[in-house]
């Protein structure tokens, strides 16, 4: 088990202590640092900055949105960052949702699984640099020969040579079909709101992908990077209460009423009625009431909270469930140091 630092995206500006957090993560033996994007700051530029200030931490996107860039442009980012960082880059990709894809990027959200498969295939072709890139799929045809084409496009391969032709690609996935696809075509799964209580169910989804012809990985060499809030405290009830507004936001505000992939995660955990109530209250603007409706048990399913012994026990449970890296958010250097100290022996350190 390893620890990664999740620094997310800017809301609305980068935290002023971010350089200190990254330096502490490197000093305290964290394995990686990840950046995200939504509809503001991008996921790649901060990694270039942090990479210049570190020498060991792996640098990942969790996640870069497919619709933000063509596959070739995304591969160029990956190729460049991996070279600049000395082979430390991890490309984490995700489809986002229709509100962002259609509302922000102005693209249709249709067939997200098929688009993901094509996208990853093109990125791997670019990074392999074995031949000019060709894709006959409907979503990202290369060369483009559709409406408006001049007919002058030709297959190309990058003029810059990649440091690694096999930069790790991980996928953010929540539903069973997407998780199975991730196991088939990716090097790891970026899991959000993972609960060890459903480890057997996740294993079924993953095994479906591993069993497909041409699957890239198997269970033994596949990474599961689970985003997780860890709070070391003697006030367990207080920490649980503090987490509820965040969960209410994801359940009610990070998707449409009829299509919210985050809400579906919690329904599959066994909270369908509560999720419906939380979503309705949140969309009506009754956010405090929505947070109050979040069950304690739901928070405990997806959060690691308690004293050092309780935290170590929960981390061990997640490791038994298949998690290889816990991706945690930290508000300050002291929290980075506390997690490092508490989890020595449970988390693999590279000091």
What would you call each of these model-derived segments?
Residues 1-351:
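Active-site-adjacent structural elements that line small-molecule/cofactor binding pockets in enzymes
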């Amino acid at each position: 088990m390893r620890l990664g630092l999740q620094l997310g995206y800017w809301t609305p500006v980068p935290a002023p202590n971010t350089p200190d957090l990254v330096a502490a993560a490197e000093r305290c033996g964290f394995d990686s640092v990840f950046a995200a994007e939504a509809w503001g700051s991008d996921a790649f530029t901060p990694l270039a900055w942090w990479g210049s200030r570190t020498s060991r931490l792996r640098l990942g996107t969790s996640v870069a949105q497919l619709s933000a860039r063509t596959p070739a442009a995304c591969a160029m980012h990956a190729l460049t960052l991996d070279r600049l960082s000395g082979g430390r880059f991890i490309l984490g990709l995700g489809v986002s949702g229709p509100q962002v894809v259609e509302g922000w990027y102005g693209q249709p959200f249709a067939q997200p699984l098929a688009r993901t498969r094509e996208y990853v295939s093109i990125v791997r072709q670019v990074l392999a640099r074995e031949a000019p890139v060709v894709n006959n799929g409907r979503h990202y045809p290369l060369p483009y020969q559709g409406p408006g084409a001049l007919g002058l496009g030709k297959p190309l391969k990058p003029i810059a040579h990649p440091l690694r032709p096999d930069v790790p690609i991980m996928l953010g996935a929540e539903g069973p079909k997407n998780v199975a696809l991730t196991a088939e075509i990716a090097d790891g799964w970026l899991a959000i709101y993972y609960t060890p209580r459903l480890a057997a169910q996740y294993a079924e989804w993953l095994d479906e992908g591993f069993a497909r012809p041409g699957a890239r990985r198997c269970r033994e060499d596949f990474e599961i990077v689970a985003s997780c809030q860890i709070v070391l405290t003697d006030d367990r009830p207080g920490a649980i209460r503090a987490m509820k507004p965040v969960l209410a936001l994801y359940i009610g505000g990070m998707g449409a009423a009829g299509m919210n992939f985050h809400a579906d995660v919690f329904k599959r955990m066994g909270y369908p009625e509560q999720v419906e109530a939380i979503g309705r209250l949140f969309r009506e603007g009754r956010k405090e009431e929505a947070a109050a409706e979040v069950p304690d048990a739901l928070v405990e399913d997806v959060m690691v909270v308690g004293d050092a012994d309780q935290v170590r026990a929960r981390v061990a449970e997640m490791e038994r469930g298949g998690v290889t890296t816990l991706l945690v958010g930290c508000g300050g250097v002291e929290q980075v140091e506390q997690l490092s100290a508490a989890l020595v022996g449970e988390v693999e350190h590279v000091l």
